[in-house]
Structures are given as structure tokens and as C-alpha cells.
From Swiss-Prot:
Coiled coil: none annotated. It is an enzyme of class 3 (hydrolase). It comes from Aspergillus terreus (strain NIH 2624 / FGSC A1156). The lineage of its organism: Eukaryota, Fungi, Dikarya, Ascomycota, Pezizomycotina. Keywords: Hydrolase. This is Probable esterase tazC. Signal peptide: none annotated. The gene is tazC. The active site is at 119 (charge relay system), 209 (charge relay system), 236 (charge relay system). Belongs to the LovG family.
Length: 265
């Protein structure tokens, strides 16, 4: 039953939010509180719970140790049980649809115009946008499944995951069952550039993040040269101070307007 309580944010454009590995939606909601505050008049944020059990991530235990249980989207090590790609994608989709349905019941009516993820969630966010791109190219726009205008990738690393391996798969892409690429990337696949996400993305990099070089690989090798970059003097976490958040807010609002997102007057 749909909520009937008046909500000034009900009709706002929606952003799908994907937490990091070894985290959960509650933690990601806390991590993004400053960003959401600045964007609260423009977007409604919908948080998804990862489908798979996980140990807490190394950057989670310091502040959110008691916020479990912890979840993940993909396998990140041999401690995570093997799963076939089809089942993994189905579980991810089920989690996303459940969050969307829950927000509809809570009164949300806006279009899903963007997807935002942190760390492993950023990999998934980019991969969902990539799937939309591939489906539109190979099956037609009506079959793309989503209509995200852009993605916000917080401290994300490649490679992209092919969520539809029957439509596109090469040595530069993972499938959803893998921990990492399991074979060398061929020069032929690199030159064909079928692994490149050309839809708009905003990348947020912490300059003190130990994984910074890997995040730059996602930006430079897997995304369009028109991708936007916001750098800040922080580690592997979401910016929380106003001075660090405002440059990202500016990029999000600017890109939203450029990609046709309509805000209420």
C-alpha cells in the first residue's frame, strides 16, 4: 500500500545508492549525510541492501563496527563462496528491485535519473550504467531496462562487470562470478574499446586513498574522456566536510541539468 502522508521529496528525481563491500545501506546513508543534505531539494535517495553476506570492510570497523550485518555485491576474495554469473546478477537485481518497490510504497514517484556507489558499490554503479549502454546499442533504447542519465562513482575501481555477458564479453571485462580478471587483457580487445563506458560519469577520488591508482584506472581506461573528476584530500571514505562536499554537489547539479534532468520550479 502506497504511503499517503505528504512528502515534499516524493516527486523528486531519484538516485539509486549502492554501498561498499563489507558495508550496508544504513552505513552508506550515514556516510552520505552531508552530500544528501546539500542535494535534498533536488533529489530523493534510494538505498539498496547488498544481496550477499560479508565480513566488515577494513574501513568500516573503525566507525561502524556495531552497524552490522554487513553485505556485499560481488566476491572480493576466496573467503566468499563461488557463485555462477547468472545467479549473482539475479540476486543483485532482486535487491535493487526490492529497494525500488519499497521506495514506491513510501511515496516516491520520481524517475531514477542517476546511480551512485562507493567502492565496490561504485564498480556496480558503473557496471549498471554500462549494461544500459550495451542494451541500448544492441537491443534498442526501449530494451535498456533503465534510464540513468549519469553515475556518481566514489572511490571506485575497475574492471567493469558485464551484467549481460551474452551481449558483450571480452578480456577487459569481468563477469559477476569473478573476484578479478583471470586472464591477460588482449591488445585486440583494448583497441576495440567495447569495454568503455561512454555515458556520463562523475568520479570522486581521495588523494590519500591507498587504492587511488586503481581508481584512476577505472577513470582513464574504462570511462569516456568526458568523464568528470572531483579530487579531495582524503582517504577511502565519502567526503563529509562542507568544503569537500560542495565541489561534488556543483558537478552533480551541473551534469544533471546537462543530461536533461528536470527539477521542479
Amino acid at each position: 500500500m502506497r504511503a499517503t502522508i505528504d512528502d515534499p521529496q516524493a516527486a523528486l528525481p531519484r538516485i539509486l545508492c549502492l554501498h561498499g563491500g563489507g558495508s550496508n545501506s544504513r552505513i552508506f546513508k550515514a556516510q552520505t549525510r552531508a552530500l544528501r543534505y546539500e542535494l535534498s531539494n533536488y533529489f530523493r535517495f534510494v538505498f539498496v541492501e547488498g544481496p550477499f553476506d560479508s565480513e566488515p570492510g577494513p574501513d568500516v570497523t573503525s566507525a561502524y563496527e556495531k552497524f552490522g550485518p554487513f553485505r556485499r555485491w560481488f566476491r572480493s576474495g576466496p573467503q566468499h563462496p563461488p557463485i555462477d554469473s547468472h545467479t549473482a546478477v539475479a540476486c543483485i537485481e532482486e535487491s535493487i528491485y526490492a529497494a525500488m518497490e519499497r521506495d514506491d510504497l513510501q511515496g516516491g514517484t520520481g524517475d531514477y535519473v542517476a546511480v551512485m556507489g562507493f567502492s565496490q558499490g561504485a564498480k556496480l554503479a558503473a557496471s549498471l550504467l554500462f549494461r544500459q549502454q550495451i542494451r541500448a546499442e544492441k537491443l534498442g533504447q526501449a530494451m535498456s531496462g533503465t534510464n540513468f542519465r549519469f553515475a556518481i562513482l566514489l572511490n571506485g575501481r575497475g574492471p567493469l562487470v558485464s551484467m549481460d555477458p551474452e551481449l558483450v564479453m571480452n578480456t577487459a571485462l569481468m563477469d559477476a562470478s569473478q573476484i578479478a580478471l583471470d586472464r591477460p587483457v588482449t591488445l585486440e580487445d583494448l583497441c576495440r574499446k567495447e569495454h568503455v563506458l561512454r555515458l556520463p560519469t562523475i568520479h570522486v577520488h581521495g588523494l590519500q586513498d591507498p587504492g587511488l591508482m586503481l581508481h584512476r584506472v577505472l577513470l582513464r581506461e574504462y570511462c569516456s574522456k568526458n568523464a568528470r573528476l572531483v579530487e579531495w584530500d582524503g582517504a577511502h571514505r565519502v567526503p563529509i566536510k562542507t568544503k569537500d562536499v560542495l565541489p561534488l554537489v556543483h558537478e552533480i547539479l551541473q551534469l544533471a541539468k546537462q543530461t536533461g534532468v528536470v527539477f521542479a520550479a
